[in-house]
């Protein structure tokens, strides 16, 4: 691979940023970060281990260097190619493409796992896609009200049958006056 802008320079003295800049300038179009790394590795004749050791530093440099611009999806370009207004539009356009791709993928439904293994205690409110409650669903069940009244009447009848022991004894109940306590508070 030849980069014309770097001809005549010693390869061992070139930084990865210089090679990336010259590479993008020569190609004239944006590139994936992985493509940039492969091209730099080929041009500088570095081993995989050398590239792995310097990739984090290079990524930091490409982010902080003012001449590069990330366009999203790990695509990089030279800032000089874009007017300031156009940069925002380019990034927004790439974001919209990402959103469209995400919308096309069907959403995965996650199965809820019961950690206790008891399937009888499923909460119906946790179910997805439950229908909304309408006024008809909220109508009162008059039969249930009648059953409740019958239960109360039966309970009252049972209480009436119970004989109370020592009903005539008086029980002393002490009542504390709370009004005196409110005057004793300190206000600082």
From Swiss-Prot:
Acidic residues bias spans: 118-150, 158-188
Signal peptide start and end residues: none
Function per UniProt: Participates in both the initiation and recycling phases of transcription. In the presence of the delta subunit, RNAP displays an increased specificity of transcription, a decreased affinity for nucleic acids, and an increased efficiency of RNA synthesis because of enhanced recycling.
Alphabetical keyword list: DNA-directed RNA polymerase, Nucleotidyltransferase, Transcription, Transferase
Record GO terms (molecular function): DNA-directed RNA polymerase activity
Pfam families the record matches: HARE-HTH
Family that this chain belongs to: Belongs to the RpoE family.
GO biological process: DNA-templated transcription; regulation of DNA-templated transcription
Protein name: Probable DNA-directed RNA polymerase subunit delta
HAMAP family linked to this entry: RNApol_bact_RpoE
UniProt source species: Lactococcus lactis subsp. cremoris (strain MG1363)
Subunit structure, interactors included: RNAP is composed of a core of 2 alpha, a beta and a beta' subunits. The core is associated with a delta subunit and one of several sigma factors.
